[in-house]
């Protein structure tokens, strides 16, 4: 590892990875096996951020359901997002930080703001270690309605509560930019308040009861981009039903999001030439991809505000790589033929094709973090 890090430092890769201070909070708010797809949605995003090289100590995964180990899961403990079963979303190294009854409105917002009492946090991994320089990805999925997201089929996260928590997190120096992805019915009703300039410029929050207050910032408003899977009055739809399990296994918005993200990691050129993402990684292009897919049956709402100019111009200047990690950037170097100046720690598999080599290079890059 020392040799590998030395090689990367010579090529400027360590500094680039360090600059990409990305963190992720991924929340599935539903319980019960019938909500299998919500757990699967969260695991799809978890898989994506890990493919991009984000280490588990920068990811907080909250799963309200027990679908992986539920007796009704004929494939337990595996989880799949489609009937093809080409990707197990629950590998042995998955790290779930908050489970089932722990996944509450209070805990989810407490992780975002880092205002949880010590007695409730049994492990440091349950905290989001972001700073004022961090870009934070917040993903939410579950059952929702007009200005609310249900938790554990009994409680509700109101849109006003989420907006207040995001504002407080910013003033407590928890992020510099935030990307919110939400997959639920009437999702845009939950994101709308995040772009209310008057609300987001409200005074700083009171001192934390946990005694761990960060210095408050006086910046005007947080820089936020949001993607909502549906408009007010619209439903979000499941992707497909697995006949063996008898339930829907993923939702269309998140399934297509995951497909887009995976394509940004696959090189378009053959081995021996510089690799480039197969699709444009800008958030504006993600919006176009989702809006034009024709498979969602709902309308995508994308917006940016705060220190950023309003969409679509702001989305043009933001990349999914900024929020999901730096591996997609390092792949452009790691994916080139091994040389004395820049080589992975081990040679590629003999006879590897370009996609196979890309997967190998991505696995190599994970060891860096």
Label each PLM-derived region with a short phrase.
Residues 2-369:
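Cysteine endopeptidase catalytic domains of the caspase/legumain-like
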């Amino acid at each position: 590892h020392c040799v590998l890090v030395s090689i990367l430092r010579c090529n400027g890769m360590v500094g680039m990875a360090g600059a990409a201070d990305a963190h992720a909070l991924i929340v599935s708010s539903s319980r019960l096996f019938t909500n299998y797809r919500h757990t699967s949605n969260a695991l799809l995003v978890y898989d994506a951020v890990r493919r991009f090289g984000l280490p588990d100590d920068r990811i907080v995964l909250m799963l309200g359901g027990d679908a992986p180990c539920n007796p009704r899961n004929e494939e337990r403990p595996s989880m799949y997002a489609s009937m093809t079963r080409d990707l197990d979303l629950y590998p042995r190294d998955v790290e779930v930080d908050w489970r089932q009854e722990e996944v509450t409105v209070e805990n989810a917002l407490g992780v975002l703001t880092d205002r949880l009492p010590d007695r409730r946090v049994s492990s440091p991994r349950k905290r989001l270690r972001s700073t004022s320089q961090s870009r934070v990805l917040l993903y939410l999925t579950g059952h929702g309605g007009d200005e609310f997201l249900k938790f554990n089929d009994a409680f509700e996260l109101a849109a006003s509560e989420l907006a207040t928590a995001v504002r407080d997190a910013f003033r407590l120096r928890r992020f510099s930019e935030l990307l919110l992805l939400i997959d639920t019915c009437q999702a845009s009703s939950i994101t709308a308040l995040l772009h209310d300039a008057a609300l987001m410029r409200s005074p700083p929050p009171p001192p934390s009861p946990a005694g761990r207050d960060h210095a408050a910032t006086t910046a005007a408003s947080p820089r936020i981009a949001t993607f909502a899977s549906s408009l007010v009055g619209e439903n979000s739809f499941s992707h497909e039903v697995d006949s063996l399990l008898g339930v829907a296994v993923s939702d269309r918005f998140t399934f297509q999001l995951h497909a887009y993200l995976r394509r940004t990691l696959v090189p378009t050129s053959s081995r021996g030439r510089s690799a480039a993402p197969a699709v444009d990684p800008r958030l504006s292009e993600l919006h176009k991809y989702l809006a034009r897919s024709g498979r969602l049956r709902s309308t995508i709402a994308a917006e940016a505000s705060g220190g950023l100019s309003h969409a679509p111009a702001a989305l043009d200047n933001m990349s999914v790589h900024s929020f999901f990690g730096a591996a997609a950037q390092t792949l452009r170097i790691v994916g080139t033929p091994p040389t004395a100046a820049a080589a992975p720690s081990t040679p590629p598999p003999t006879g590897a094709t370009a996609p196979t080599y890309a997967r190998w290079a991505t696995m190599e890059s994970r060891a860096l973090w």
